[in-house]
């Protein structure tokens, strides 16, 4: 083959390979998990703040989380409930928006948090102590609400929901 025909053949393969990746990504997104919806309240020294949440309870839901979302309402989030306290590590793979993460104990108390997780990062974000759940919210929410270790997340899962 000449250099030109080799170049065209490589270009054609690259385009076909790229199309296959796009088709696979589209198929993967078409099979995204769905999430039950709920409400919770974050209580800090600044007050009580209601949030509309989605619940990630199954392994497929937890693996997907907020991946591929382009936006999240200011008073929205996702609660990952692992059922019992354990070491938890999260990452931001395929997550397009920066997030804050609150790590929560059985009683709803915040035991740790991570602010401004970087979109698309593969770095592990780990709890310093075992936690039962993780609440993901928009980056800046922890600072805006003044969240501190020991603050309370009220939700039926923790047996402390507010009426």
Predicted regions and their residues:
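N-terminal secretory signal peptides and thylakoid transit peptides that target proteins
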Residues: 2-22, 26
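Compact, glycine-rich, soluble single-domain proteins
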Residues: 31-163
């Amino acid at each position: 083959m000449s250099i030109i025909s080799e170049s065209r053949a490589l270009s054609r393969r690259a385009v076909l390979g790229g199309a296959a990746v796009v088709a696979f990504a589209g198929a993967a997104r078409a099979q995204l998990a769905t999430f039950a919806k709920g409400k919770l309240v974050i209580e800090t020294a600044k007050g009580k703040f209601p949030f509309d949440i989605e619940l990630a309870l199954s392994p497929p839901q937890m693996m997907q989380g907020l991946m591929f979302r382009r936006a999240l309402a200011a008073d929205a989030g996702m609660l990952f409930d692992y059922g019992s306290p354990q070491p938890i590590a999260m990452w931001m793979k395929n997550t397009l928006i920066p997030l804050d993460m609150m790590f929560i104990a059985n009683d709803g108390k915040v035991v740790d948090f991570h602010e401004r997780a970087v979109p698309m990062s593969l770095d592990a974000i780990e709890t310093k102590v075992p936690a039962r759940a993780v609440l993901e919210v928009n980056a800046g929410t922890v600072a805006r609400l003044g969240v501190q270790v020991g603050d309370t997340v009220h939700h039926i899962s923790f047996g402390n929901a507010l009426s």
